[in-house]
């Protein structure tokens, strides 16, 4: 039985996610206990084939509008709210899966999944985007130097359900007026959210490999 990872391909950086998952499958296939495949997802028939879904960075407003206008929103909503499925939202994907937005909320009809309040464009304009070396070793073994790229990135301003949402990583406050910024979190063991773009870490598949091992395969084996 093949476990299928879908990458939402309505808009945004979906190809980069596909390539990273493909690289994981090629390089680690002997270490995964299940056969894996990856596919782009543009409609409900493709979505129905998936066990997990990555919602990429891009433009959350455009993503939301396309899903509504094509009649795809309800299918996406049902998928991500199914506890047997796995969802990962990166950057715009984090915005799209969140329950609340603290700014520009009327522009995006979210999937109302992740129980957090999110601020859009918290890092400013595109010219203020940056890559920061982050120590994720508290949740990814030996990953203490990951290049996390933030592009007009959102941040999690508030966790609305601390019982089920776990903060995985905060940026230190030295460049943010002393305020720590939540940029990675998970809800239960099947929903992951990141402000940054792991798919833009060239030739570095550690984050995607961890997602596959800790979310996709563990959830599938239940």
Curated annotation (Swiss-Prot):
EC number of this enzyme: 4.3.3.6, 3.5.1.2
Residues involved in L-glutamine binding: 58-60, 120, 151-152
Pathway it works in: Cofactor biosynthesis; pyridoxal 5'-phosphate biosynthesis
PROSITE patterns to which the protein is assigned, alphabetical: PDXT_SNO_1, PDXT_SNO_2
InterPro entries for this protein: Class_I_gatase-like, PdxT/SNO, PdxT/SNO_CS
GO BP terms: pyridoxal phosphate biosynthetic process; pyridoxine metabolic process
Catalysis: reaction(s): aldehydo-D-ribose 5-phosphate + D-glyceraldehyde 3-phosphate + L-glutamine = pyridoxal 5'-phosphate + L-glutamate + phosphate + 3 H2O + H(+); L-glutamine + H2O = L-glutamate + NH4(+)
Keyword terms, alphabetized: Glutamine amidotransferase, Hydrolase, Lyase, Pyridoxal phosphate
GO terms for cellular component: cytosol; glutaminase complex
Catalytic residue positions: 91 (nucleophile), 197 (charge relay system), 199 (charge relay system)
Molecular function terms, GO-annotated: glutaminase activity; pyridoxal 5'-phosphate synthase (glutamine hydrolysing) activity
Anything else known: Present with 195 molecules/cell in log phase SD medium.
Family: Belongs to the glutaminase PdxT/SNO family.
Biological function: Catalyzes the hydrolysis of glutamine to glutamate and ammonia as part of the biosynthesis of pyridoxal 5'-phosphate. The resulting ammonia molecule is channeled to the active site of a SNZ isoform.
Protein name stated in the entry: Probable pyridoxal 5'-phosphate synthase subunit SNO3
Species annotation: Saccharomyces cerevisiae (strain ATCC 204508 / S288c)
Source lineage: Eukaryota, Fungi, Dikarya, Ascomycota, Saccharomycotina
